[in-house]
């Protein structure tokens, strides 16, 4: 597994950057999107090791 930095822009225009541990870039992106959509982006755990909101 590798660490990937995934940047997502929400519907409100906020930029969220998650550091996700995953087997591939696409898996990291899907995990990050799911976490943001479910309101779990601030939950540190097995897959998400860092979360930053830029604006």
What spans do the regions from the language model cover?
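Intrinsically disordered, low-complexity Ser/Thr- and Pro-rich stretches
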Residues: 4, 18-19, 41-44
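Compositionally biased, intrinsically disordered low-complexity regions enriched in proline and serine
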Residues: 4-5, 24, 48, 53
């Amino acid at each position: 597994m590798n660490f990937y930095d995934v940047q997502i822009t929400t519907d409100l225009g906020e930029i969220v950057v998650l550091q996700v541990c995953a087997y591939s870039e696409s898996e990291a992106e899907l995990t990050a999107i799911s976490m943001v959509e479910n309101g779990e982006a601030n939950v540190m755990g097995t897959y998400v090791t860092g979360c930053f909101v830029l604006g």
